[in-house]
Each structure stands twice: as structure tokens, then as C-alpha cells.
Amino acid sequence: MSQEILEKVRSIVAEQLSVDAAEVKPESNFQNDLGADSLDTVELVMALEEAFDIEIPDEAAEGIATVGDAVSYIQEKKG
């Protein structure tokens, strides 16, 4: 897992969900651990798309449940 991508995702998640970045770990589930609702999740995906200049299709977004999932997906897209 790329530390650089993880740190950027951690920062974005903390800002979007108004949580302490220290709480944002690779295994953190957006809904169960970080309190995101469905609207938060959509906004988070949009923020990640913008920050990393990628497109995350709805079907892919549905499979991203944790911070680690997001990092892995972004790593894969960025090659």
C-alpha cells in the first residue's frame, strides 16, 4: 500500500467526514467506523476523484468500503 496515497486519502477522509486523521486507518470502514452515511460516501468518492484525477464508476464505488479499499483502487488506477 502506497504510503503517499494513504496519507492523501486519510487527509481527504478526515476532512470530508469531520473526523480526526488519527482515527482514519486502512481497515477503517467508512460507514461502520467513521460514521459516513450514503451522501457522505458520494461526496467522499467525488473528492477522491478530484484529488487523484481519476474516475470511480458507481459499480466500483460500491465495492470501496474501507480506507484500504480506496487506496488499493486508486493505486490500481494510477498504475
Swiss-Prot record:
Keywords: Cytoplasm, Fatty acid biosynthesis, Fatty acid metabolism, Lipid biosynthesis, Lipid metabolism, Phosphopantetheine, Phosphoprotein
Primary location group: cytoplasm
Pfam families: PP-binding
Highest taxon, organism lineage: Bacteria
Location of this chain's protein in the cell: Cytoplasm
One GO term describing the cellular component: cytosol
Stretches assigned to coiled coil: none
Purpose: Carrier of the growing fatty acid chain in fatty acid biosynthesis.
Designated name of the protein: Acyl carrier protein
